Amino acid sequence: MECELVDLSNNNVGSVELNPLIFSAKQKLSILHDIVRWQLAKRRVGAHKTKGISDVSGTTAKPYGQKRTGRARQGSLRSPQFRGGGIIFGPVVRSHAYSLNKKVRKFGLKIALSLKYLNNQVVVLDSLNVDVKKTSKMCEYIKNFKFSSFLIVGDYGDDLLRAAKNLHYVDLIKPIGLNVFDILNHECVMLTKDTLKHLEGRLL
């Protein structure tokens, strides 16, 4: 699978071979769905919390005698039926993360990259070694590509990161951090030659 190799100005500088095991995987959208749910569950903070009967402040004394009052028996003023009482079975601080098979995660990454390649939304860059320090200069480069949002994957410098930081439609990510959710969340995926080598070592 041969793909055009371009620079950030979208000028052709050669060609590069794409591994068909990564960029022509069988499409199984159910796996993408499972992985996106897994990623979103992992990133949930889970900081919701209500006070239970043991957390609310108040006396522990029995409010009145068990018998001879004619009222329903009560053992605590912190019970949920009283004003200011605790919440029963309320949310507690917890992790929403769950495990997902490593083979499934690898396969999902192949499916996502194949889907982008199938829709002509993969761009292979020769490198990210460009002198970009201003956001305006980064905008000039990005305008050479006719897409609405970009995920740039490669080993970038601090200057390039700073230049792209203020563009809401451009995200930079290291090859080790490439994931299904970010791939699907951007229209165009830009990969460097070095990233392709990294993916072969990671996914094959």
Curated annotation (Swiss-Prot):
Residues 56-79 are annotated as: Disordered. GO terms for molecular function: rRNA binding; structural constituent of ribosome. The lineage of its organism: Bacteria, Pseudomonadati, Pseudomonadota, Alphaproteobacteria, Rickettsiales. GO terms for biological process: translation. This is Large ribosomal subunit protein uL4. One of the primary rRNA binding proteins, this protein initially binds near the 5'-end of the 23S rRNA. It is important during the early stages of 50S assembly. It makes multiple contacts with different domains of the 23S rRNA in the assembled 50S subunit and ribosome. GO terms for cellular component: ribonucleoprotein complex; ribosome. InterPro entries: Ribosomal_uL4, Ribosomal_uL4-like, Ribosomal_uL4_dom_sf. It comes from the Bacteria. Belongs to the universal ribosomal protein uL4 family. Keywords: Ribonucleoprotein, Ribosomal protein, RNA-binding, rRNA-binding. Part of the 50S ribosomal subunit. SUPFAM superfamilies: Ribosomal protein L4 (SSF52166). It holds the Pfam family Ribosomal_L4.
